[in-house]
Amino acid sequence: MSLFEWVFGKNVTPQERLKKNQRALERTQRELEREKRKLELQDKKLVSEIKKSAKNGQVAAAKVQAKDLVRTRNYIQKFDNMKAQLQAISLRIQAVRSSDQMTRSMSEATGLLAGMNRTMNLPQLQRISMEFEKQSDLMGQRQEFMDEAIDNVMGDEVDEDEEADEIVNKVLDEIGVDLNSQLQSTPQNLVSNAPIAETAMGIPEPIGAGSEFHGNPDDDLQARLNTLKKQT
């Protein structure tokens, strides 16, 4: 603490002074509330004594006690009025503090906005916006070009696969027609010897059939055609 503060006291801001006064008012309100509770207890005690004096026939004592009761209730009423006034003053102080805080906040915000406006370069911001829009359009065009190129490549591959499938199916169909026509024109004695020819070509015999197995040549040829189609 400096000598100036020790002699004249610490320099207190208006906000701190208002806060200090508000604390003092709240402390006074609590003291008034305690005194009011004491008077209320005194009120109940006087009422009990007045009833007791009246039962005992002590009229004079009852009148004195009644006057004390009236004064006590008047004090209670005064304490209520004082407390209400102090609460009103405390609310006003709180409103002043809030207004001061809001004023300072608005002042700081105004200064901040003013500084931002001074440092903001509108022409530069406009150039940046135009350049951003230009680059975005360029990127969109390049993306469209890449998408079209990929679609073309994938489309060619799909077309090639479809054409290859058509050729294979056509060849297999032609082979099937030729084989069927040959089977229809083959004599019965050649058909009976078909298992021997198929064995010479490398067709495996069924398990357990031995050399006496005689299969149907039409079924065997059809099975071979189906196998070729599945492999393609």
UniProtKB/Swiss-Prot annotation:
Changing residue 228 to D: Abolishes interaction with VPS4. Keywords: Coiled coil, Cytoplasm, Endosome, Membrane, Protein transport, Transport. The lineage of its organism: Eukaryota, Fungi, Dikarya, Ascomycota, Saccharomycotina. Residues 183-232 are annotated as: Interaction with VPS4. Belongs to the SNF7 family. One of its GO terms (biological process) is late endosome to vacuole transport. It comes from Saccharomyces cerevisiae (strain ATCC 204508 / S288c) (Baker's yeast). PANTHER family: CHARGED MULTIVESICULAR BODY PROTEIN. It holds the Pfam family Snf7. This is DOA4-independent degradation protein 4. Required for the sorting and concentration of proteins resulting in the entry of these proteins into the invaginating vesicles of the multivesicular body (MVB). Acts a component of the ESCRT-III complex, which appears to be critical for late steps in MVB sorting, such as membrane invagination and final cargo sorting and recruitment of late-acting components of the sorting machinery. The MVB pathway requires the sequential function of ESCRT-O, -I,-II and -III complex assemblies. Can directly stimulate VPS4 ATPase activity. GO terms for cellular component: cytoplasm; ESCRT III complex; multivesicular body. Residues 203-232 are annotated as: Disordered. Residues 14-97 form a coiled coil. It is found in: Cytoplasm; Endosome membrane. It is a peripheral membrane protein. The gene is DID4. A motif (MIT-interacting motif) lies at residues 219-229. Core component of the ESCRT-III complex (endosomal sorting required for transport complex III). ESCRT-III appears to be sequentially assembled as a flat lattice on the endosome membrane and forms a transient 450 kDa complex that contains DID4, oligomerized SNF7, VPS20 and VPS24. SNF7 oligomerization into a membrane-associated filament is nucleated by association of SNF7 with VPS20; the process is terminated through association of VPS24, possibly by capping the SNF7 filament. VPS24 subsequently associates with DID4/VPS2.
